[in-house]
């Protein structure tokens, strides 16, 4: 089952040397293993969207989607798969 977090939850992210996320802290904590990456850019209505999404496994057991929002310079967890 998928749980979409509304609003998305802000987290602190540690990146590796290649700029991939390797750990998060905040409402969700632990090491993460990135699985997939994609970018979304566009001008939705009156606010531009520039996001880098990652699908990752948190603590070896929880699949989640997180993204970096370049317009506010912040990471968020947006979706978890139970």
Name each model feature, range by range.
Residues 1-82:
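Non-catalytic peripheral regions of nucleotide-handling enzymes
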């Amino acid at each position: 089952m998928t749980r979409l977090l509304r609003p998305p939850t802000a987290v602190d992210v540690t990146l590796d040397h290649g700029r991939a996320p390797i750990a998060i802290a905040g409402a969700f904590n632990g090491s993460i293993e990135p699985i997939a990456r994609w970018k979304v850019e566009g001008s939705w209505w009156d606010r531009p969207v520039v996001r880098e999404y990652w699908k990752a496994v948190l603590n070896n057991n929880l699949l989640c989607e997180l993204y970096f929002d370049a317009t506010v310079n912040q990471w968020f967890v947006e979706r978890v798969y139970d």
